[in-house]
Structures are given as structure tokens and as C-alpha cells.
A protein has these predicted regions:
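Alpha-helical transmembrane segments and their helix-helix packing motifs
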Residues: 1-186
Length: 186
């Protein structure tokens, strides 16, 4: 409900772009977690149907693959489909686009200038140019790498846009030992 209301009423300013960017990164992370939960399952396990339903992808998958349920195709669909909004590839591309708009450089002559932009582009291109048939090889490692990318992108965005101020905490050291000053960053 919130997503529909936000999409239909919010101005397309930086706040909206941050919301879309965050939602896309979170969608990548959650889809990776869904896939990681099924990596060890057999190809004919009914758990793959559950995975598709959990992602709201069951009907679209059935239309795309004409009803043939296969673990390899489910993984391919959830990772690489360019038209399904909850696939990892689609979400990475959406996150890249949102970040380009935030940087006010959608058609820059230079490549990635921000760390988050570089990380998103690398993750997307690794999926996009994956060798045919290599998708299921070391799937758990590839998914763990995507999860790490989501975490790294979040940290890069925090450093780039949300500057933290150093904090000072005064604590009583106890029984006549003086005052201790602790410093760090929020």
C-alpha cells in the first residue's frame, strides 16, 4: 500500500530517488536470501514453487516458461529476467538508474565516479555477461557476493550522502579515577 501511495503522490525529487534506490537494493538482498534458502534443494522440490510465490513471481514465471517448473529456470528467472521487477538484474539496473539521477549525471561522458555506482555496475555486468550454462556453478558463492555488494553499496552511500559527525561521550570513571572522554563517529 505504501509503495503504491508513494509512487502516485510523491514528487520526483531526491527523496523519491533515495526511496527507489533503497527499495531496489533491499529487493536484491531479499531475493538473494530467498535463493540462498533453496540452494541445496533438489531440482524437482516443491520448495521452488514456494520461492516463486514468496517473491510474487509464480504467475509471471509460469507465463514466461509455459508452466515448466525447473530449478535452473527458477534461478535464471529470479536472477536474470530483464522484465520482472523483482528479479535481481532488474533491481540492480533500477538502483543504478536511480543513483545516476541522484548524481544528476544520467548521460555522463565518464564512467562510474562514485563507489556505490561502481559496485552496482560491476554486479549488474557480472550477471549480464555470465557465460550461458554457468549460472548454477558456484551459485551460493555468487549469491553471497551479491549480498556483500548490497552491504558495501549501503556503506558507500552512507559515506557519500549521510556524513556523520564525531561524537564525544563523557563518562564517570567511577571512584575518584577521573573523567574519561570517549571519541568516535556516529
Amino acid at each position: 500500500m505504501f509503495a503504491g501511495l508513494a509512487d502516485s503522490t510523491l514528487s520526483r525529487d531526491d527523496g523519491y530517488r533515495f526511496m527507489v534506490l533503497g527499495r531496489a537494493i533491499e529487493r536484491v538482498d531479499m531475493t538473494v536470501r530467498l535463493l540462498l534458502s533453496r540452494v541445496g534443494d533438489s531440482g524437482s522440490s516443491p520448495a521452488w514453487v514456494t520461492l516463486l510465490r514468496s517473491a510474487g513471481a509464480h504467475d509471471t514465471y509460469l507465463r514466461t516458461y509455459r508452466g515448466a517448473l525447473d530449478a535452473g529456470r527458477v534461478v535464471e528467472f529470479m536472477l536474470l529476467d530483464r522484465l520482472f521487477p523483482r528479479s535481481i538484474f532488474y533491481s540492480l539496473r533500477l538502483a543504478e538508474h536511480s543513483l545516476d539521477e541522484l548524481l544528476n549525471r544520467p548521460h555522463s561522458r565518464l564512467g562510474a565516479t562514485a563507489e556505490a555506482q561502481r559496485l552496482l555496475g560491476r554486479a549488474r555486468s557480472e550477471l549480464e555477461f555470465l557465460q550461458p550454462g554457468a549460472l548454477l556453478e558456484s551459485l551460493d558463492g555468487r549469491l553471497a557476493g551479491l549480498q556483500k555488494t548490497c552491504r558495501d553499496v549501503g556503506e558507500a552511500l552512507a559515506l557519500q550522502y549521510f556524513h556523520s559527525a564525531p561524537w564525544v561521550a563523557w563518562t564517570d570513571a567511577g571512584h575518584g579515577e577521573g573523567v574519561v572522554i570517549e571519541e568516535g563517529e556516529v
